[in-house]
Design a protein with these regions (language model features):
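N-terminal helix-turn-helix DNA-binding module of bacterial transcription factors
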Residues: 1-69, 346
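Alpha-helical recognition/docking segments in bacterial nutrient-uptake
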Residues: 1-5, 67-179, 183, 197, ...
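Hinge/beta->alpha junction and helix N-cap segments in small-molecule ligand-binding domains
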Residues: 60, 77-87, 106-114, 140, ...
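Short helix-capping segments at alpha-helix termini
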Residues: 98, 148, 212-219, 244-247, ...
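Periplasmic-binding protein-like
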Residues: 126-134, 190-193, 224, 245-255, ...
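Short acidic capping loops at alpha-helix termini that bridge into adjacent secondary structure
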Residues: 187-189, 219-223, 272-278
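Flexible loop/turn connectors
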Residues: 239-346
Length: 346
C-alpha cells in the first residue's frame, strides 16, 4: 500500500483486514487505557503487525488532540557520550519517530540521587511513558512513588525486581567467551567485571565464570575485578591482574572500553596481545575491528534493543501484558584472543 497509493492510512489498514476503521483507529491511536479494550488480543495483534509491515505513521498532532496524550516518551541513560548508550538511543529515536512520537532524553550518570531527580523532571514533561536505560540491579530508583501509574520499560539492563526489560542475553554472551578461551586451552583466566550494580556486568561475568566452573576450573575471587565501564577503569583493573608473577593468560573485559584499557595496561607491561595475553571484550563497538590488534568481542544488537524497547513501552501504554525480551549475542573472533596454547579441558 505504501509507495503504491500514497501514505498508509487507517482506512487502508481496515480494508486489508476486513475491519471497521474505528476499530483500527482505537487500537493504534486510542487513549492508552482504551487500546487494550478496543479489540480482542488476536485482532489487535493483527492490526499492529500489518501497521508495522506497511510502515504506518500516525499524525502526532491529530493523535494528541484526539487522545489527550502528549506523544512524548522520556528516556533515561547513564551518559549519552558512551557509544553503546548512543547506539541504543539511536534505535529508540528511530522507532519513536516511526511511531509518531518524540523523545526527551536525559543523563543520570548512574547516580541514584540524580536518577530520582531526573525521573521527576521527565515526568513533569507529561510524558506518556519512560524508557529507562540506567537501572540498577536492586531497582531502588524504580520504587519511587512518582512512577506509580506511569508505564515504563527498561533497556540494556534488567533488575532483580522483575520490571519488563529489553536486553542482550548477557549470560550467554559471557558463556560464549568462556567457551572460546577453553577451546584455546586457557585455564588461568580473569574477568574485568564492570560495576557490581549493573546487570550487564554481573550477568556477563556470571555466564563466563559458570562455564569455567562447569569445566572444573573455578575462578579465584581475586581474578574477578570490578571497575568502571571505561578505559581508565579497565586499565587499572588489568594492571592489578597482570603486574604480579601469578598472572592470567586470558582476560574477559565485560565491555569494549574496559578491554581497550586492558590493552593499554598490557602494552605498559610489555605484553603482546594474542601471544602473551588473550583478550576479549563485549558489544563489538565499531572501534573493536580497527584497533592495532583487532579485538575479539561479543556483538550485541544495540540499536535493536532500543527499537524493541519502544514497541514494548507502547504495548504497556495500551494496557497489554508484556514480558521481558532477550536478544541473542554473537562472538566475533579477532586477533586479540590469539591462537591455541594447549588442549581444551576434558
Amino acid at each position: 500500500m505504501a509507495g503504491e497509493s500514497g501514505p498508509v492510512t487507517l482506512r487502508g489498514i481496515a480494508e486489508r483486514l476486513g475491519l471497521h476503521v474505528s476499530t483500527v483507529s482505537r487500537v493504534l491511536n486510542g487513549p492508552s487505557g482504551e487500546q487494550g479494550r478496543a479489540a480482542s488480543g488476536e485482532t489487535a495483534r493483527r492490526i499492529r503487525e500489518l501497521a508495522d509491515e506497511l510502515g504506518y505513521r500516525p499524525n502526532p498532532h491529530a493523535t494528541s488532540l484526539r487522545t489527550r496524550r502528549s506523544n512524548l516518551v522520556g528516556v533515561l541513560f547513564p551518559r549519552l557520550s558512551e557509544i553503546v548508550v548512543a547506539t541504543i538511543y539511536e534505535g529508540v529515536e528511530e522507532e519513536a519517530t516511526r511511531r509518531g512520537l518524540s523523545t526527551f532524553v536525559t543523563n543520570t550518570h548512574d547516580d541514584p540521587a540524580t536518577q530520582r531527580e531526573r525521573i521527576g523532571m521527565v515526568l513533569g514533561r507529561r510524558v506518556d511513558g519512560l524508557i529507562i536505560g540506567d537501572a540498577h540491579l536492586d531497582g531502588a530508583a524504580l520504587a519511587d512513588p512518582a512512577l506509580d501509574g506511569t508505564p515504563f520499560v527498561l533497556v540494556n539492563r534488567r533488575t532483580d525486581t522483575g520490571h519488563p526489560a529489553v536486553t542482550c542475553d548477557d549470560r550467554l554472551g559471557g558463556r560464549r567467551v568462556a567457551e572460546h578461551f577453553l577451546d584455546l586451552g586457557h585455564r588461568r583466566v580473569a574477568v574485568i567485571a564492570g560495576e557490581p550494580f549493573a546487570s550487564t556486568g554481573t550477568d556477563r561475568t556470571t555466564g563466563f565464570t559458570d562455564r569455567y566452573r562447569e569445566a572444573g576450573l573455578p575462578l579465584p575471587a581475586h581474578w574477578v575485578r570490578h571497575c568502571g565501564f571505561d578505559t581508565a577503569g579497565g586499565h587499572r583493573a588489568a594492571a592489578e591482574l597482570l603486574s604480579g608473577p601469578d598472572r592470567p593468560t586470558a582476560i574477559f573485559a565485560v565491555n569494549d572500553l574496559a578491554a581497550i584499557g586492558t590493552m593499554g595496561a598490557a602494552r605498559d607491561l610489555g605484553l603482546r596481545l594474542g601471544e602473551d595475553l588473550a583478550l576479549a571484550g563485549f558489544n563489538d563497538t565499531p572501534l573493536a575491528a580497527e584497533l592495532p590488534v583487532p579485538l575479539t568481542s561479543v556483538r550485541s544488537p544495540m540499536a535493536e534493543q532500543g527499537r524493541r524497547a519502544v514497541r514494548l513501552l507502547l504495548r504497556r501504554i495500551a494496557g497489554e501484558p508484556v514480558a521481558s525480551e532477550m536478544l541473542g549475542p554473537e562472538l566475533v573472533v579477532r586477533a586479540s584472543s590469539g591462537v591455541q596454547i594447549g588442549p581444551p579441558p576434558r
